[in-house]
Curated annotation (Swiss-Prot):
Lineage: Bacteria, Pseudomonadati, Pseudomonadota, Gammaproteobacteria, Enterobacterales
Protein name: Multidrug resistance protein MdtB
InterPro entries named among the record's database cross-references: AcrB_DN_DC_subdom, Acrflvin-R, Multidrug-R_MdtB
Gene Ontology MF: a single term: xenobiotic transmembrane transporter activity
Superkingdom: Bacteria
First-listed, main subcellular location of the protein, grouped into a coarse class: membrane
């Protein structure tokens, strides 16, 4: 069956050419809708691709990691494990803290996940320890997601406990209410409390125990219902002085009588106003501070959330005393806005470059204005559809629009060039517009739908990568569709009204020079093409070699996942020996902070020491380093990290791990480095056997750097081995022993002070200043059956052992996470393969499993689907072209151009030192759509010449190549210049945009040269093949 062109009647463009007012108003409506839509589009760094994630934190001061695991974490995990839609569950149990992170499937709404988590916590309540100070608290937040904003609250006139109290009640609560905020944490929070430090010798001399004191305090401070009196005429509410509010009141509390004389709490203890947890501390630029970290909910718009916080900050700070200073240390939206601004500038630059190349070729202002109108109209009209689809203005959608500048102008160029050709031959503009638009209409439709077909596989990519690029693909597809509509409606109408034979022939010296140059180039191309057609097998050999080279380059090119961005914020972990105390860690962080703040690129620094939901152990500290803006420093973030690590390396007893924050966060736990690999077993003993072996093996690999693990099993522990028979004979139970130890060393929260604004705790502990270390255990006394006191040493033997500092689970089983970076000269693909090879070499047993986590796991998934993604794009394009041409052969001819694009893109990436990451892969997929345009324009005209003019296939393709050479060159250069600003970008977020530009520019340069010669040769080869098939199988002879 023969494909007939629309003819000279104008085809689908006829109505719009003949009704210019209606066409103008229709385009004005598209423009207006786009302008209005733009005003409603939110701004973000990337599309919303967050997994629904919820963190559950349970604090149990004084509990060991083993107790936290068995008594708190395990019961919660059993209930959470029954929830539907749960993708992954990880937990970390350390001294006094249990953190369970729940990651759900992408398709599950966060609110539904929240309901399931709340129900699971309720079901586990009866299984948890009865003396938990607070029930488990959940937050709709991913702990690995860096804070969107960090504020430091300092004062040179008030104690930190008072500052913390004001910040918690007046500032943090209000910020928590902002839409999009998932969690506000107060790092180093010195919450006010009454601290009771018992003098062990004093209570022993009086025959008392710490349990006697605890019972007296809890009985003296209550706040419960008392009822009311309801008389015949009046009702009276009952109240009492059952609450004690200050340290002075507790100091005067009578806890016992000795020989008729009262023993007050102040006689046997130091009672003072202090902090609830004395092992927490935070610093901002080395000054003690309350550091407020604001994290967003998964899926919340970071810009809108930060703007809302900024708007309320002045009002919140006014409620604080003048001596309290609130400083915004970091705001991730600053870099996001700068990145978006840079991308917007590159978009405008791309438009300007495209219009410039149009003028260079057409050398006519009216002819330049026409596609110059089509470009912004197509891009602006896209905004209206983006609003409807709940998209945002982000780096990826702006990159799509930047690339689209080269795409959307193609259709207009093809139409203008064809109409101009008829006007130059002497036809009237209206007739030329009708004839030229009708002739080219099928080509426009072919170009449009075949290009959109390339994007279809992107829409069906699964998991987070598919969600990430859905907005990119749809935005680009919408721009291309609008461009096709504009090119078939507005462009021919404007050509009929604005172009004339006189205007096209009007030339100045520059125009004549350009014309002579183009004539010489076309003539040279014609001579070269004639030689190529005379030596087809040599050309086919080049095409085949190109295919082989593409495969070879694909194999050898370094592969990565997502470009490492320079967002101006570095997250760090400071690691010390496992037996380090809070005091020693505080000293170490001061030394490290001093070195870091000396770096010229560093603007501010916050550090935190202590155990809470973010920091698992006392021997580690968290750091956040805020760099100066990119234009105010000389080095990129990786260079700064290297310099800082070198500066800190000379400090004994510490290891500093640093990594830049990223806009794309896939992990569910804060890691020391960028990539993670887990080793999981059914028991801790199995882990303890294999972790050192695997860690040593990984540390020896050149493809990995800064290898570390969270396995810490050498923490000092005092094992109290109770002689149960002796204890039973004295009437002492194990509960008595645990209570005595907890009272002395657990910073036990024994009572609550209620106020109108907040609640504060009474903390009980032994004053160990005079008896540090294990000697403090000798001061513990217990009450025996006869009422006397017995030293702990009488019934127990104290042993010093090693114990884990934290116990980690993944889906309820023990796990260790190895963290690593990739050194310069290697790629993530190299590192992954090296780890897999090492795993095979070690021959791990069946009950030991390994798995990559976070971005490394996503890299594996993306790498595995990349080849199929490209194959799917090619198949989709073949189907679309086959349907349009009603031919099995012609689509193959068109698709034969694709290897040239791959060679150019891969070579350009290798030369530029870039990895083949998912951004570059998107560029290659787009190249598939661009490069085949050349072949479509050639083949369309060759088929028309054969059909309408009776030309031979050789003459037809030769003429088509010469006639379409100029529009092919124009459209290719337009696409190249559209991608050029991305390739040359140097501003904020350039790391994200550059791979796309490099791949496209390299692919276009190589393919432009090769396809102009290989396509006509392959066209003739398949024509002869078609004739051969028809002669051998006449029953199946095609009509096309």
């Amino acid at each position: 069956m023969q494909v007939l062109p629309p003819g000279s009647t104008g085809g689908p463009s006829r109505l719009f050419i003949l009704r210019p007012v209606a066409t103008t108003l229709l385009m004005a409506a598209i423009l207006l809708a786009g302008i209005i839509g733009y005003r409603f589009l939110p701004v973000a760094a990337l599309p919303e691709v967050d997994y629904p994630t919820i963190q559950v934190v349970t604090l149990y001061p004084g509990a060991s990691p083993d107790v936290m695991t068995s008594a708190v974490t395990a019961p919660l995990e059993r209930q959470f494990g029954q929830m539907s839609g749960l993708k992954q569950m990880s937990s970390q149990s350390s001294g006094g803290a249990s953190v369970v992170t729940l990651q759900f499937q992408l398709t599950l709404p966060l609110d539904v996940a929240e309901q399931e988590v709340q129900a699971a916590i309720n079901a586990a309540t009866n299984l948890l320890p009865s003396d938990l100070p607070n029930p488990p608290i959940y937050s709709k937040v991913n702990p690995a997601d860096p804070p969107i904003m960090t504020l430091a609250v300092t004062s040179n006139a008030m104690p930190m406990t008072q500052v913390e109290d004001m910040v918690e009640t007046r500032v943090a609560q209000k910020i928590s209410q902002v839409s999009g905020v998932g969690l506000v944490t107060l790092a180093g929070g010195q919450r006010p409390a009454v601290r009771v430090k018992l003098n062990a010798q004093a209570i022993a001399a009086l025959g008392l125990t710490s349990e006697t004191v605890r019972t007296a305090i809890t009985g003296a401070n209550v706040n419960s219902a008392k009822g009311s009196l309801d008389g015949p005429e009046r009702a009276v509410t009952l109240s009492a002085n059952d609450q004690m509010q200050s340290a002075d009141e507790y100091r005067r509390l009578i806890i016992a009588y000795q020989n008729g004389a009262p023993v007050r709490l102040g006689d046997v203890a130091t009672v003072e106003q202090g902090a609830e947890n004395s092992w927490l501390g935070a610093w901002a630029n080395q000054a003690p501070a309350i550091v407020m970290n604001v994290q967003r909910q998964p899926g919340a718009n970071i810009i809108a959330t930060a703007d809302s916080i900024r708007q309320m900050l002045p009002q919140l700070t006014e409620s604080l005393p003048k001596s309290v200073k609130v400083t915004v240390l970091s705001d991730r939206t600053t870099n996001i806005r700068a990145s978006v601004r840079d991308t917007q500038f590159e978009l405008m630059l791309a438009i300007a470059l495209v219009v410039m190349i149009i003028y260079l070729f057409l050398r006519n202002i009216p002819a330049t204005i026409i596609p110059g109108v089509a470009v912004p109209l197509s891009l602006i009209g896209t905004f209206a559809v983006m609003v409807f689809l709940d998209f945002s203005i982000n780096n990826l959608t702006l990159m799509a629009l930047t690339i689209a500048t080269g795409f959307v102008v193609d259709d207009a160029i093809v139409v203008i060039e064809n109409i101009s050709r008829y006007i130059e031959k002497g036809e009237k503009p209206l007739a030329a517009a009708l004839k030229g638009a009708g002739e080219i209409g099928f080509t426009i439709i072919s170009l449009t739908f075949s290009l959109i077909a390339v994007l279809i596989p992107l829409l069906f990519m699964g998991d987070i990568v598919g969600r990430l690029f859905r907005e990119f693909a749809v935005t680009l597809a919408v721009a291309i569709l609008i461009s096709a509509v504009v090119s078939l409606t507005l462009t021919p109408m404007m050509c009929a009204r604005m172009l004339s034979q006189q205007s096209l022939r009007k030339q100045n010296r520059f125009s004549r020079a350009c014309e002579r140059m183009f004539d010489r180039v076309i003539a040279s191309y014609g001579r070269g093409l004639a030689k190529v057609l005379n030596h087809p097998w040599l050309t086919l050999s080049v095409a085949f070699a190109t295919l082989l080279l593409s495969v070879m380059l694909w194999i050898v090119i370094p592969k990565g996942f997502f470009p490492v961005q320079d967002n101006g914020i570095i997250q760090g972990t400071l690691q010390a020996p496992q037996s380090s105390s809070y005091a020693s860690m505080a000293q170490r962080q001061r030394q490290v902070a001093e070195r870091i703040l000396q770096d010229p690129a560093v603007q501010s620094l916050t550090t935190f020491v202590g155990v809470d939901g973010a920091n698992p152990t006392l021997n580690s500290a968290r750091l956040q380093i805020n760099l100066k803006p990119l234009d105010a420093r000389d080095d990129r973030v990786q260079q700064v990290i290297s310099r800082l690590q070198t500066a800190v390396a000379t400090i004994p007893g510490v290891a500093l791990y640093l990594q830049p924050t990223q806009d794309l966060t896939i992990d569910t736990q804060v890691s020391r480095t960028q990539y993670q690999f887990t080793l999981q077993a059914t028991t801790l003993d199995a882990l303890s056997h294999w972790v050192p072996k695997l860690q040593n093996a990984l540390q020896s690999l050149p493809q990995l750097s800064e290898v570390s693990s969270d396995w810490q099993d050498r923490g000092l522990a005092a094992w109290v081995n109770v002689d149960r028979d002796s204890a039973s004979r004295l009437g002492i139970s194990m509960a008595d022993v645990d209570n005595a130890l907890y009272n002395a060393f657990g910073q036990r929260l024994i009572s609550t002070i209620y106020t109108q604004a907040n609640q504060y705790r009474v903390v009980l502990e032994h004053n160990t200043a005079s008896t540090p270390g294990l000697a403090a255990l000798e001061t513990i006394r217990l009450t025996s059956r006869d009422g006397g006191t017995v030293p702990l040493s009488a019934i127990a033997r104290i042993e010093q052992r090693f114990a884990p500092l934290s116990i980690n689970h993944l889906d309820q089983f023990p796990v260790t996470t190895f963290s690593f970076n990739v050194p310069e000269g290697y790629s993530l693909g190299d590192a992954v393969q090296a780890i897999l090879d090492t795993e095979k070499t070690l021959a791990l047993p069946a009950d030991i499993t390994t798995q990559f986590q976070g971005s490394t796991l996503a890299f594996q998934a993306a790498l595995g689907s990349t080849v199929w993604l490209i194959v799917a794009a090619v198949v989709a394009m073949y189907i679309v072209l086959g349907v349009l041409y009603e031919s099995f052969i012609h689509p193959i001819t068109i698709l034969s151009t694709l290897p040239t694009a791959g060679v150019g893109a891969l070579l350009a990436l290798i030369i530029a030192g870039s990895e083949l990451d998912i951004i570059a892969i998107i560029g290659i997929i787009l190249l598939i759509g661009i490069v085949k345009k050349n072949a479509i324009m050639m083949i369309d005209f060759a088929l028309a010449a054969e059909r309408e003019q009776g030309m031979s296939p050789r003459d037809a393709i030769f003429q088509a190549c010469l006639l379409r050479f100029r529009p092919i060159l124009m459209t290719t250069l337009a696409a190249l210049l559209g991608a050029l600003p991305l390739m040359l970008s140097t501003g904020v977020g350039a790391e994200l945009r550059r791979p796309l530009g490099i791949a496209m520019v390299g692919g276009l340069l190589v393919s432009q040269v090769l396809t102009l010669f290989t396509t006509p040769v392959i066209y003739l080869l398949f024509d002869r093949l078609s004739l051969y098939v028809k002669s051998r199988f006449p029953r199946h002879k095609e009509e096309a």
